[in-house]
């Protein structure tokens, strides 16, 4: 390949994958690749995958099939990363003969070398886990991209082994980055114009617990909050059992810490929570919610719900609905249970019929839709501080997020990107808010 080389990245799954895709783009920029939004003109296509549910995994294979003919028509390299890559490894190269390279969740640092080999016709898979401190030194950072928000990885992996979850098998055990590296990365990002950071990890609340002498997650938040020029701090994802009183106190004491937390309950029944190996009861979860709201009364809480878990009775399911009503989530991600390889739940009996699971999922989503619309309507007439991120998808409005992580669209000058502005909310929609500048600028 000579001259300009174009890279297209398709990202499936969570915010960690979005962050990893940013790092992929940064690494390959050093190999002469610039990004394109059009896969049909790309010289290299990277598909960053998710395997949390079977549906997401099947979607990846379907997506890869689109490029078989394209590769016959012209010179094109195709790579797969992320959790499906980690899970399948060499099998992906055999199953998808038109695939050139496969890299796992711990192997991003090898990507430049693998691409160079692929350019010479060599197919490779690299999916070795690095479950020790050495992997911390291999975290590639995304380039300064000119945006006002930034994802910052603070830890990787998970040690909880919830019975339904494949994450420990495809992301590895928990390892925390050194706080000095995290703080240095954020200082550099702020110097480049970033005003908001989202701290990422499969279980951010356990940050530092396995590293002698390291800060706790609450301590890390306090250090980051002291960085001049940084306006807002967010984090995801939190495991309810690991939320400490020290962390809850941060919501009362740190104005830069945004008033939103993603707190996955997964179910409202103690028997199902126990079968899921979640490590808390319904009451313990509700006590954490109450403590968070005592610390920050206006905090908005989002969550995850799984329906159709093996053995879930109608009574168990009704407990989930009642939990949702008691918490009053702003929004949730809701899913039908999906058996995953290697997980403990995959061998459980008492499977729920698909029809019943689908019906329960519809009831969950209907209840949440009503609560979300009601919650959004409650913001109409209020004035919200919005960090302007840029132009909306429609292109004729600005968009940004409130402290509580709600998307707001409004008319304004594009030069406001990166600014905190007051927006009066005029209308609530299921997925966003509409507003107008309180003082037109």
UniProtKB/Swiss-Prot annotation:
InterPro entries reported in the protein's UniProt record: Elp3/MiaA/NifB-like_rSAM, Methylthiotransferase, Methylthiotransferase_CS, Methylthiotransferase_N, Methylthiotransferase_N_sf, MiaB_methiolase, rSAM, rSAM_horseshoe
Pfam families: Radical_SAM (PF04055), TRAM (PF01938), UPF0004 (PF00919)
Cited SMART domains: Elp3 (SM00729)
Keyword Cytoplasm part of the UniProt annotation: yes
Chief place of localization: cytoplasm
Top enzyme class: transferase
Function summary: Catalyzes the methylthiolation of N6-(dimethylallyl)adenosine (i(6)A), leading to the formation of 2-methylthio-N6-(dimethylallyl)adenosine (ms(2)i(6)A) at position 37 in tRNAs that read codons beginning with uridine.
Protein's UniProt name: tRNA-2-methylthio-N(6)-dimethylallyladenosine synthase
Organism of origin: Geobacter metallireducens (strain ATCC 53774 / DSM 7210 / GS-15)
